[in-house]
Amino acid sequence: MKIAELNLPQALKDFYTGSGIPELYPPQAEAIRQGLLDGKNLLAAIPTASGKTLLAEMAMLKSIAEGGKAIYIVPLKALASEKYDRFLEFSKLPIKPDGVKVGIATGDFDSRDEYLGEKDIIVATSEKTDSLLRNGASWLSGLSVVVADEVHLIDSPNRGPTLEVTLAKLRKINVNLQILALSATIGNAKALAKWMDAALVQSEWRPTTLKEGVFYGRAITFKKEKRTVNNAGPDEVNSLVADTLEEGGQCLVFANTRKSSESIAQKVARSLSKKLQPAEKEQLAKLKQDVLRHAETDTCEKLAECVGNGVAFHHAGLKGEHRRIVEDGFRQNILKVIACTPTLAAGLNLPARRVIIRDYKRFDVNYGSVPIPVLEYKQMAGRAGRPRLDPYGEAVLIAKNYDEFGELMENYINADPEHITSKLGTEPAMRAHALSAVATDFCRSRQDLKAFMDTTFFAYQRGDLSHVIDNVLNFLLEENMIIESKGGSLKATDLGSLVSKLYIDPLSAALIAEGLEKAKKRPDVAEFGLLHLICSTPDVKSLYLRRGDYSWIIRYADEHASDFLSDVPDSYGDDVEFEQFLAGVKTAALAEMWINEKSEEAITTFFNIGPGDIRNLMETCTWLMHGTAEISALLGAPATRTARELAIRIENGASRELLDLITLKGVGRVRARKLYDAGYTSRDKLKAAEIPAIAAIPGIGDKLAVSIMSQLGRKVDHTPPETEEQPQVSGQSTLFSFDG
């Protein structure tokens, strides 16, 4: 089916044909026949790289040309940025007089973001979309198309319930809405399509042939052929990587832990470094410098060394800047190999000639080492083969013995993906969504709420949710977040409305409110008490306790005994409860290190985590501390000012004395400290300074000095020279002392 034949605006057809896409892939053509361009709901359950995004673009842009508006829902912020960048390419498309306006929404969860109403395409995470619904964003009722990318993640215990409820709500508020769901190949696609009232396009077709096999005995056994790996040595991964690179391909290597991915990258880098050409070394040296420009920890320096040899590792413990450098370097074929954890398979567009799945088992805290689902394997395998660049793609598992070889062939290569199931039917999943439905007047009684929940995928699969709903509503009543009249109508209290808008778990809010009531009886509220309070909530993923942690954490808890705003369990009582308490103390200790300006290196070393983990954890803590300040203000507790200051300090990793400087754009924790130590302890002192004096401070430079003065409202005549801005450098490097 030719692009030129489609019922699309001519400008869009010209755009695609001019981009080298003259005709559709078979699954895309089937989607057209099923009514994609006629406003019909559609579920496309097709492999990676078979053109799902193009389906979304055509549906959205045709609707926009007719006066509509679209939202593109993704599971990850990184994927949102990738799609946003792609859709910006349509901004000058003359299908509307003023072009196509694109927006992105991944930030604060307590805003309506009404400015997005001016956009034609909005890219958002499912959590952000849910929060926009809770905060009453008026433009949502004007949507004509909703695209749900990676919709099979309804199966995820963490993200699934939010995506499921969000889709159900959007369908209810706009009956003419077209829903386009994009999914990996799943076992029960028909059931998911039926729930959505959608036509189903299901296919195994790929533009690049995918060969799936198992490496054992110096050969890869595929379904229909066997291939010997030349010069295979004792290290299977190195052998498979070398074999791919000799043919001009790139490799992704999936490992089950961050440490394993780093170890693999280092081994492959040592091997590859001897084979690099001078021109390649020059490109890689530049990329290495890009990594070092943002380096503050051993992990970053380790990454830089690997990158200098054409290899990288990629996991959630890396800083966002480093992940982007790695991804871009791989897309540009400067980096040849990435060793990564399975998070890379969750949507990011980074295909490679060969995908090596080194580990097919992962550790589960309840069951030990367990095999990964077939669906997860298929997601990783689907990254093999770059369309129009590779003649084929290969996904290779590694067997350690003959029995394992047979198991891998049967359980993965020749297996079908599992059915996905809704995870909405638990009280933790239901709490926030029930409160949201009541707080937004979406549901005004128990009957309303049950009727709405009957429209979810959970109800479609498993039936009645009444018992769970009743338990959750009773909890919300007990915690004074909703009230129920004698006539049965439900209404949110001021606390309930606030909690819903803040987008935090009602149980977290209940624990925070309880702690703040205790604060009313204290002469003052300790910072550590507030840090521990938020780190003890279900919204914060507490740090794991290691064997060597117990003595210092118990000692530290004793030193802060008078600070705690939550009950301190008896160490001789419930072991689980006491361990949870200690985990909260450990996590709060990390937050305290962060706001006391300890270096990332000190924190990552002491707590054995990655720099990306610090950022992710502090982002959550910032939001919860902001929520704590809002709840404190509502309850009239004495913690409001302290909590507001702490939220700013956690966000920036700064001491209290830097509050006046830290909120200046471009001034991070390290630069603020340098300014303060140079005598510029306030904005007034900074404003009175001479620009050259500010620029001379290490890490500032002319460009930032001019920017700072402009932000302070000072007239600037100084023109900075055209020099590269100095990178931020690491500050303190001493390990955290628990002696006060």
UniProtKB/Swiss-Prot annotation:
The residues the record assigns to binding ATP are: 28, 46-53
Its UniProt entry gives the catalysed reaction(s) as: Couples ATP hydrolysis with the unwinding of duplex DNA by translocating in the 3'-5' direction; ATP + H2O = ADP + phosphate + H(+)
* UniProt-listed SMART domains: DEXDc, HELICc
**Intervals of motif DEAH box:** 149-152
Outline the segment boundaries, as ranges, of region: Disordered.
716-740
Any idea which GO molecular function terms this record carries? 3'-5' DNA helicase activity; ATP binding; ATP hydrolysis activity; DNA binding
For the protein in the UniProt heading, the enzyme class is isomerase
Q: Which domain of life is it from?
A: Archaea
* Domain (Helicase ATP-binding): residue spans on this chain: 33-204
* Keyword DNA repair applies: yes
GO biological-process terms attached to the record: DNA repair
**Subunit structure, interactors included:** Monomer.
Its family remark reads: Belongs to the helicase family. Hel308 subfamily.
Alphabetized HAMAP family for the sequence: Helicase_Hel308
Q: What is this protein called?
A: ATP-dependent DNA helicase Hel308
Organism whose genome encodes this protein: Methanocella arvoryzae (strain DSM 22066 / NBRC 105507 / MRE50)
Source lineage: Archaea, Methanobacteriati, Methanobacteriota, Stenosarchaea group, Methanomicrobia
